[in-house]
Amino acid sequence: MKASMFLALAGLVLLFVVGYASESEEKEFPRELLSKIFAVDDFKGEERGCKGFGDSCTPGKNECCPNYACSSKHKWCKVYSGK
């Protein structure tokens, strides 16, 4: 009886996954999402004259974007807390 309940539940889960996948293909959601992500990355790379979070920097120079500061310990831009 436990095995039949497990198989029935597994079948319902499989049906749900297949239905969701076919609906997502119709909307082309994954491709659209990826294209938007890469478009945002390209935009940031062209427009930014300063370094953002996690970018390598030289302590003492003002290379990081506003609200970021160059960490002298790690030598990358991090969020500036004002302390």
From Swiss-Prot:
UniProt keywords, alphabetically: Disulfide bond, Ion channel impairing toxin, Knottin, Neurotoxin, Presynaptic neurotoxin, Secreted, Signal, Toxin, Voltage-gated sodium channel impairing toxin
Domain notes for this protein: The presence of a 'disulfide through disulfide knot' structurally defines this protein as a knottin.
Cysteine disulfide partners in this protein: 50-65, 57-70, 64-77
Residues of the propeptide: 22-48
Organismal lineage: Eukaryota, Metazoa, Ecdysozoa, Arthropoda, Chelicerata
InterPro entries, per the entry: Huwentoxin-1, Huwentoxin_CS1
Signal peptide (residue range): 1-21
Family classification: Belongs to the neurotoxin 10 (Hwtx-1) family. 15 (Hntx-3) subfamily.
Recorded GO CC terms: extracellular region; host cell presynaptic membrane
GO molecular function: ion channel inhibitor activity; sodium channel regulator activity; toxin activity
SUPFAM superfamilies hit by this protein: omega toxin-like
Originating species: Cyriopagopus hainanus (Chinese bird spider)
UniProt key word Lyase: no
Function: Lethal neurotoxin. Selectively blocks tetrodotoxin-sensitive voltage-gated sodium channels (Nav). Does not affect tetrodotoxin-resistant voltage-gated sodium channels or calcium channels.
Tissue: Expressed by the venom gland.
Main location: secreted
Protein name from the UniProt record: Mu-theraphotoxin-Hhn2h
Subcellular location: Secreted
